[in-house]
A protein has these predicted regions:
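P-loop NTPase motor domains
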Residues: 7-21, 27-202
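Glycine-rich phosphate-binding P-loop
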Residues: 2
Length: 202
């Protein structure tokens, strides 16, 4: 939505459900929009979930006019798979972009060295440098590291307010991917339940 048309309804649902539903995403200067695309309550990471994480990282890593090479896509896919494997085994690791970044910087760097992956095939230092603004205290460190541990799968009413972010070249693509991943996840996993996606004033 744009224009806060659903703010009142969303607040009412949030209040009536004791905060369990009526989830409102918007951007404010003192409370910027944030997500955690790596978090799931049940640690289920199906094909769509993994692909959405890879697409999200690719969007932040590469410009529109800079398509990734096949070797880079494979390296990223392996990094995501190995990271998911690690957080499934060690539930003390908090799934978010920060821990993924740390994993690539330390563990995955060793994997690449052991496999003799050449820098021209996957430049891990360049990868980390480009994504550093989304890590911890970086300019966009808030964006993919939400501490709310919110799994949107079973939330029945979610509003994404795009007024402030629709012209932002960094935030808008991320929010769009999150919206599509949320809806696809509901379509695939919530069998026998009617779903609706409403695009208002698009």
């Amino acid at each position: 939505d744009t224009g806060n048309s659903y703010k009142g309804l969303c607040d009412l649902i949030h209040q009536k459900t004791g905060g369990d539903d009526g989830i409102y995403f918007t951007y404010k200067e003192n409370d910027p929009i944030s997500f955690n695309p790596f978090f799931t309550e049940d640690y289920q990471y199906d094909i769509e979930k993994r692909d959405s994480i890879k697409t999200l990282i690719l969007t932040l890593w590469k410009r529109e006019d800079e398509p990734p090479r096949r070797s880079e896509e494979v390296a990223l896919s392996n990094a995501v798979s190995l990271y998911i494997e690690k957080i499934r085994k060690n539930r003390k690791i908090k799934p978010n972009f920060n821990s993924f970044y740390d994993f690539v910087r330390k563990d995955y760097r060793k994997v690449l060295a052991d496999k003799n992956v050449r820098e021209k095939d996957f430049d891990v230092d360049g990868f980390l440098n480009v994504l550093e603004p989304y890590y911890k205290n970086g300019e966009y460190g808030y964006l993919l590291n939400s501490d709310k541990e919110l799994d949107l799968l079973n939330k029945r009413f979610i509003v994404f307010e795009l007024d402030v972010v629709k012209d932002n070249p960094i935030l808008f693509p991320v929010v769009t991917i999150i919206i599509m991943e949320t809806f696809i996840n509901k379509m695939r996993r919530l069998q026998g339940i009617r779903k609706m996606i409403l695009i208002e004033e698009a």
